[in-house]
């Protein structure tokens, strides 16, 4: 058997996540997959919550490739690119959004979060508003992926409503939704958020005469 370490535990857990979903991901099943006794696993992960936290960090480390702004990039472009990358990372794994729910920045992510916040304040946001803008986009992305993954999982269990029973606008709306893999609806909502931040920021910068924004939106 290959030497057991934290990386091999995480690799096996990600495989098991894709096989069973988050509800089937247990420390007992993970130990079985690794061919070890459950107490041995506790040397690497103490419980399921610790395992999920580790998976959330690892998913982003492996697949979230736009966590920092590029040189000269606008804040609008960064929020957009960051959200799209975050979405792609969550979609790489079954129940990826559920894994990420309720997590907080890991110590390995502190510098990234600090850089993001500094970038937003350098672009005119107060710390509070920059934080809320980043959080709003993150929460929207997480919710959109959660809904998409839950919808996909439910397709096999829930029969489709007969078209003849649907009102005309609802029927057309469902056709629009069925023709979209979730990306177009996501981008539409994301742009609406960013435009809203633009309006608020522009209005407040005008109030303070173009100086650096130091008052919150609320």
Swiss-Prot record:
Show where the HTH tetR-type domain sits. 3-63
Indicate what this protein is called per its UniProt record: Tetracycline repressor protein class D
Q: Name one GO molecular function term.
A: transcription cis-regulatory region binding
**Keywords for this entry?**
Antibiotic resistance, DNA-binding, Magnesium, Metal-binding, Plasmid, Repressor, Transcription, Transcription regulation
InterPro entries, from UniProt?
DNA-bd_HTH_TetR-type_CS (IPR023772), Homeodomain-like_sf (IPR009057), HTH-type_TetR-like_transc_reg (IPR050109), HTH_TetR (IPR001647), Repressor_TetR_C (IPR004111), Tet_transcr_reg_TetR (IPR003012), Tet_transcr_reg_TetR-rel_C_sf (IPR036271)
Q: What functional role does this protein have?
A: TetR is the repressor of the tetracycline resistance element; its N-terminal region forms a helix-turn-helix structure and binds DNA. Binding of tetracycline to TetR reduces the repressor affinity for the tetracycline resistance gene (tetA) promoter operator sites.
Q: Where is tetracycline bound in this sequence? A: 64, 82
Name of the coding gene:
tetR
Q: What induces it?
A: By the [Mg-tetracycline]+ complex.
Which positions does UniProt annotate for Mg(2+) binding? 100
Q: Write down the species.
A: Escherichia coli
Any keyword Transcription? yes
Which one GO biological process term can you cite for this protein?
A: response to antibiotic
Q: Which Pfam families match?
A: TetR_C_1, TetR_N
Portion annotated as DNA-binding: 26-45
Subunit description: Homodimer.
